[in-house]
């Protein structure tokens, strides 16, 4: 994932948490904030309750892969994906479905792509 597609600074994370809207399902919470830019930016947070560093990094890699696969469908907003406990035990396909579901609930998918439930 290119650096231009990442939310990295603490100031940006805090702005999204403070001024953005949140949406959640059982496995993910998404905070999103509309910004005037030509592409999306994403931050990923996996807490220490999820497991050891190896497990957390594996979860982050899977989330990053799903986000980049859906990249052409995402609206130009900043958003933060927070993984909840239990996400570490999901297979890739289940993680993809859960993440797609919460993005759809947050209305972060462009019109026309929302009907594509399964890939």
UniProtKB/Swiss-Prot annotation:
MF annotations from Gene Ontology: 3'-tRNA processing endoribonuclease activity; ribonuclease P activity; tRNA binding
GO terms for biological process, alphabetical: tRNA 5'-leader removal
Keywords in alphabetical order: Endonuclease, Hydrolase, Nuclease, RNA-binding, tRNA processing
InterPro entries found in the cross-reference section: Ribosomal_Su5_D2-typ_SF (IPR020568), Ribsml_uS5_D2-typ_fold_subgr (IPR014721), RNase_P (IPR000100), RNase_P_CS (IPR020539)
Catalytic activity: Endonucleolytic cleavage of RNA, removing 5'-extranucleotides from tRNA precursor
Gene Ontology CC: ribonuclease P complex
EC number: 3.1.26.5
Signal peptide: none
Matches recorded under Gene3D superfamilies: 3.30.230.10
Pfam families from the UniProt entry: Ribonuclease_P (PF00825)
Subunit structure, interactors included: Consists of a catalytic RNA component (M1 or rnpB) and a protein subunit.
Protein family according to the UniProt entry: Belongs to the RnpA family.
Protein name: Ribonuclease P protein component
Species whose genome carries this gene: Streptococcus pyogenes serotype M5 (strain Manfredo)
């Amino acid at each position: 994932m290119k650096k231009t597609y990442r939310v990295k600074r603490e100031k940006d994370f805090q702005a999204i948490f403070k001024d953005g809207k949140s949406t959640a399902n059982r496995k993910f919470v998404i905070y999103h904030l509309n910004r005037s830019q030509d592409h999306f930016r994403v931050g990923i947070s996996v807490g220490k309750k999820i497991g050891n560093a190896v497990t957390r990094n594996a979860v982050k890699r899977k989330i990053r892969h799903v986000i980049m696969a859906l990249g052409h469908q995402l609206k130009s907003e900043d958003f933060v994906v927070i993984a909840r406990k239990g996400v570490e035990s999901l297979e890739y396909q289940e993680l993809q479905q859960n993440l797609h579901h919460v993005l759809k609930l947050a209305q972060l998918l462009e019109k026309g792509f929302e009907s594509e439930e399964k890939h």
